[in-house]
């Protein structure tokens, strides 16, 4: 029996990630002078890098935490797609399920970070380069077929949807087959996820919860409103666990047994440096914790601790196992919210 402050051994777990592979592109700069062309600052370029983002970031987190990791998705035959694959392969992640496709651009999020010398880089601007069309149906079907073939051979599946069209009914059908074969299946959603009814867990942020329940974020700011929306999803879409991530507000876990919610405040005592990739880190850690047999509240605490590690770093940084082991003993403990209400349906 593991004590609450011990991270389980994830090395025996085989985990697949399916979803939208993204390139996170960082441009680093130092302030120079005011421009004579416009009332803006001229920045002096001092470096850049491309990191795996989206589902690729989730895969890197799983691997860094010790799991045997497979990734399924698509990339374009462009520099960003090749670079994302190169870095995944460098980490000994199985990318045989990734399809390079024509008539596509690998989604790329360019973040410009700047600061004075000796200070922490802060994000100044983000520019997104996205494909003009969604992933084609025949490509989705091919990926889903590969995914379904993993049923019975993996311990967990993490579905990372960033809205580029890969995650659809075909992937949902394959996910149900994998879950029926005994694996934990976790969805990090974007928009409607009714096709994933009965899945092990869904991890929306506040905006995604609002999209799924047709509510504005402003209407979800009280715990009562949040719990009402969560109960609606538990009834309608029926995930076993609903973990709502609230940024610096922490996380709230809802289940049919705990419809009022179990909360945990955000981990980390320092000022947040960069939230890029924190969602993927939390999803990866939560998936592994469930696959290792932890109950929902303990899995949430571990995911919160992992997210608290990466927000202290600039860029899309995965959470190393050693850092998680150091952070977990100091991570906040979950607490129940005494606002019970029955879940029906």
What residue spans do the PLM features occupy?
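Conserved N-terminal subdomain of the carbohydrate kinase-like
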Residues: 6, 15, 23-156, 318-345
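A short, aliphatic-rich alpha-helical micro-motif
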Residues: 10, 151-152, 196-197
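Structural motif
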Residues: 16-18, 126, 155-158, 186, ...
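Active-site metal-binding loops of divalent metal-dependent hydrolases
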Residues: 21, 162, 281
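Flexible glycine/proline-rich, aromatic-decorated loop/lid segments
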Residues: 33-38, 199-207, 212, 250-279, ...
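Extended, hydrophobic alpha-helical segments in both membrane/secreted and soluble proteins
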Residues: 158, 174, 183-195, 199, ...
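Conserved phosphate/ATP/ADP-binding segment of small-molecule kinases
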Residues: 164-261
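Conserved post-catalytic alpha-helical subdomain immediately downstream of the catalytic base
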Residues: 237-240, 244, 267-331
């Amino acid at each position: 029996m593991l004590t609450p402050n011990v991270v389980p051994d994830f090395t025996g777990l085989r985990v697949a990630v399916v979803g939208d592979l993204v390139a996170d592109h960082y441009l680093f700069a130092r302030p120079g002078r005011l421009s004579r062309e416009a009332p803006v600052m001229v920045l002096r370029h001092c470096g850049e890098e491309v990191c795996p983002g989206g589902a690729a970031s989730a895969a890197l987190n799983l691997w860094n935490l010790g799991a045997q990791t497979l990734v399924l998705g698509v990339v374009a035959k462009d520099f960003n797609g090749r670079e994302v694959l190169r870095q995944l392969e460098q980490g000994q992640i199985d990318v045989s399920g990734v399809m390079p496709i024509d008539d596509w651009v690998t989604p790329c999020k360019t973040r410009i970070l700047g600061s004075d010398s000796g200070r922490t880089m802060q994000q100044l601007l983000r520019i997104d380069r996205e494909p003009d069309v969604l992933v084609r149906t025949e490509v989705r079907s091919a990926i889903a077929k590969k995914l379904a073939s993993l049923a019975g051979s993996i311990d967990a599946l993490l579905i990372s949807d960033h809205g580029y069209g890969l995650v659809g009914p075909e992937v949902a059908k394959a996910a149900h087959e994998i879950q029926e074969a005994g694996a934990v299946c976790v969805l990090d959603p974007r928009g409607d996820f009714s096709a994933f009814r009965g899945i092990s867990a869904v991890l929306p942020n506040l905006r995604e919860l609002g999209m799924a329940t047709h509510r504005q974020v402003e209407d979800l700011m009280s715990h009562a409103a949040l719990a009402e929306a969560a109960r609606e999803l538990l009834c309608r879409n029926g995930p076993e666990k609903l973990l709502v991530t609230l940024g610096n507000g922490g996380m709230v876990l809802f289940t049919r047994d705990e419809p009022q919610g179990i909360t945990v405040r955000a981990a980390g005592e320092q000022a947040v440096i960069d939230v890029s990739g924190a969602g993927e880190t939390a999803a990866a850690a939560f998936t592994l914790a469930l696959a290792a047999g932890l109950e929902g509240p303990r899995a949430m605490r571990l995911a919160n601790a992992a997210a608290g590690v990466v927000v202290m770093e600039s860029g899309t940084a995965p959470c190393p196992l050693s850092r998680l082991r150091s952070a977990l003993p100091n991570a906040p403990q979950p607490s129940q919210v005494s606002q019970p209400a029955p879940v029906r349906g």
